[in-house]
Amino acid sequence: PFGHAGEAALTDMMGTPFHHNEQSLRVVDKLERDGDGLNLTYEVRMAILGHTGSRIPETLEGQVVRTSDRIAYINHDIDDAIRAGILSESDIPREIADVLGSSHSARINTLVENMIANTQNTGVLSMQPEVAAAMDSLRSFMFDRVYTNPVAKGEESKAKDIMRKLFDYYYTHPDKLPEDFIPQLDFDGISRTICDYIAGMTDKYAIYKYSEIFIPTAWQVR
């Protein structure tokens, strides 16, 4: 949960780097089907592992997933920033909007359709240079205006605090883990088991569990 803030929190608590792509591969290889894994193909597994980070996917399937992930998260992050009042559509530089479009759907259509058309023309998974440059500029803009924004950073510290408190709670109360995770304690240890459980939460579920554990239930007024 909580994107890169959650990754950073789990890294601190585990004492080793936590990467969500590696965790996703762990889920399908080792955790699903009661530890038997899903027996996925090499291509699918490498697409999961290579969708982010410095590792460039070896397969076309992996390259499609990696590019699709970038298209998705940039545009969803714009929507989140607009809802949070950090950004408005009019803040996006005109030179970027002129190439990609000035709405969520327009940007995604431009990027996806251009990638398909240019790949068909060149035989290499790619976008036209102008569109690729606009996407890179949009990503840089998001780092300048959103990812390092003090408001966003403030929310990030709250998210990390939720993660740490959940981790500490389950570390001292492992019996409170879901029943499915109890057997895992014997062969993966307490920290790894808690990490797997928390890493599988959504933002909303992490907040719900935090509230359930740490926020007193209000007295019902009669």
Regions flagged by a language model, labelled:
Residues 18-222:
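Histidine-centered, transition-metal-coordinating active-site segments
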Residues 1-15, 21:
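Aspartate-rich (DDxxD/NDxxD/DxxxD) Mg2+/diphosphate-binding motifs
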